[in-house]
Regions:
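Beta-strand C-termini and the immediately following turn/loop, strongest in propeller blades
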Residues: 1, 23-40, 49, 59-60, ...
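Non-catalytic accessory segments flanking enzyme active sites
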Residues: 1-13, 17-23, 36, 68-72, ...
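Repetitive beta-architecture junctions, highlighting loop-to-beta-strand starts
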Residues: 2, 31, 43-45, 54, ...
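Polyanionic (Asp/Glu-rich) segments that form extended negatively charged tracts
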Residues: 5-6, 44-51, 55-61
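Short, flexible loop/turn elements at secondary-structure junctions
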Residues: 11, 37-39, 49-52, 63, ...
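Solvent-exposed strand-loop boundary residues in beta-sheet-rich modules
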Residues: 51, 101-103, 147
Length: 167
């Protein structure tokens, strides 16, 4: 009809900051929408019916937060995203990267070192460079496969030995 209408209406009794969290990824010619929401108290991904505006399923769930959506692949029905707080016993502020199917199955950790990761993907998302570090650890860069997170090769490992020796 060409008449605009509300598909998704988010309301909360508490303050919700969305300025840096807006994820609205239409897929399947707009018949579905990947949407980021804090509706369960944590920042997670949901699959919406793009025609009716109803939640079809919650893609991610748990006591952890999705930070950012990196890529939505409608053909493979996969999402690559960053998150924090997912790994028990680890600093909850460390950022890790994951891949998951639209139906919430097949979660694959793409990063594993207990550190904050910065990832740069190849244009086809088949491989990526994972650079990770902590305040007590110099950066390490590795080339990895997106299919399973396997390390293909270490690219670089910084060393602070000379600085520590110099005092």
């Amino acid at each position: 009809s060409g008449v605009p209408r509300v598909l998704i209406d988010e309301q909360a009794k508490t303050y919700v900051e969305y300025s840096s969290k807006i994820v609205f990824e239409p897929v399947n010619d707009g018949k579905e929408i990947v949407w980021m929401s804090e509706r369960d108290g944590w920042c997670h991904l949901y699959l919406y019916d793009g025609v009716k505006g109803a939640v079809k399923s919650q893609i991610t769930k748990g006591d952890w937060a999705v930070r950012n959506v990196i890529n939505v692949d409608p053909r493979r029905r996969e999402i690559i995203f960053s998150a924090n707080g997912m790994r028990p016993g680890e600093d909850p502020y460390f950022v890790h990267y994951y891949r998951i199917n639209f139906d919430g199955s097949g979660l694959v950790a793409l990063t594993d070192a207990p550190a904050t990761h910065t990832v740069k993907f190849s244009p086809d998302y088949s491989v990526y460079v994972d650079t990770w570090s902590r305040v007590d650890m110099a950066p390490v860069s590795q080339l990895r496969k997106t299919s399973d997170g396997a390390v293909l090769m270490e690219l670089e490992r910084a060393s602070t030995d000379a600085l520590v020796a110099a005092g």
